[in-house]
Amino acid sequence: MLAPKKQKFRKAHKGRVASKAKAGTTLAFGSFGLKSIDGWRVTARQIEAGRKAATRCMKRQGRLWIRIFPDVPVSQKPAEVRMGKGKGSPEFFAVRVSPGRIMFEIEGVEENVALRALELASAKLPVRTRIVRRYE
């Protein structure tokens, strides 16, 4: 799973995904991409599940790029613990995905295979997505 090697701070603010993405909104590597329609927090496990689903569909042909990286530590308190007494320990990493952000890109496979792979990957993600092509 994806995680930063080193962090400046152990814990982060909850934050919000407010505005549209300013960078990473166009295809940079592949011919087909998966673009987010709404903003949400995507965890490292969800990214990995999407990657596995897409590469299985592609039968390990072609190339897949992941354009997002989970760099925000998300902390949680244990179950059935009373309020207060601190924030809780970091449990996993996530990325705040803004609307319009390209998350996955595919190159080197036929169009129908690429579209099917991106559909399978989008089913693993909590954000609504659309598939974009290079020539759109």
Curated annotation (Swiss-Prot):
CDD domains in alphabetical order: Ribosomal_L16_L10e
GO terms (BP aspect): translation
UniProt keyword annotations, A-Z: Ribonucleoprotein, Ribosomal protein, RNA-binding, rRNA-binding, tRNA-binding
Molecular function in Gene Ontology: rRNA binding; structural constituent of ribosome; tRNA binding
Cellular component aspect of the GO annotation: cytosolic large ribosomal subunit
Keyword Ribonucleoprotein in record: yes
Residue ranges of coiled coil: none
Gene3D superfamilies recorded: Ribosomal protein L10e/L16
Pfam family, one: Ribosomal_L16
Described function: Binds 23S rRNA and is also seen to make contacts with the A and possibly P site tRNAs.
Family: Belongs to the universal ribosomal protein uL16 family.
Subunit and partners: Part of the 50S ribosomal subunit.
Name of the protein this chain belongs to: Large ribosomal subunit protein uL16
Source organism of this protein record: Rickettsia massiliae (strain Mtu5)
Lineage: Bacteria, Pseudomonadati, Pseudomonadota, Alphaproteobacteria, Rickettsiales
Gene this chain is encoded by: rplP
